[in-house]
């Protein structure tokens, strides 16, 4: 196992985002923990939620490892294999779980994460639902979603 830690900050937001993407492109797993077990001053003190850390990782083909937020929404949008819950209270046990997952990892797992993220997390799906509720879905949005579907079917 190797651990990279946080990507470096860039001179501007664009550079920082590129460092993050480069880091995710090298990763197989990303450690992330629900606020229920890892509170921080910049998170909600009582609410659990899935953050951009989880969704960006999944969209990059990376499996989330840690403690997933226990909410109805998270259970609805995530798929089997999107995340691996590990023992957050015992670092040795948690690392053993990560080592086991790393030993079983295949490139197909990363491809599956990307495919599933396109199907479940892409905002265009939500825009379609909003537009339907308003009575009309723009043809460009429909075309985008059809192209996306073709992409995740072909992967």
Give the positions of each predicted feature.
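Nucleotide-sugar donor-binding catalytic core of glycosyltransferases
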Residues: 1-78, 123-126, 137-140
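A short acidic, often aromatic-flanked loop/helix-cap motif at beta-alpha or helix-coil junctions
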Residues: 9-13, 89-94
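Pocket-edge positions in alpha/beta enzyme catalytic cores
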Residues: 12, 49, 86-87, 118
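Active-site proximal loops enriched in glycine and acidic residues that flank catalytic Cys/His/Asp
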Residues: 68, 87-88
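A short acidic/histidine/glycine-rich donor-binding loop in glycosyltransferase catalytic cores
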Residues: 79-87
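C-terminal amphipathic helix plus adjacent low-complexity
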Residues: 84, 92-155
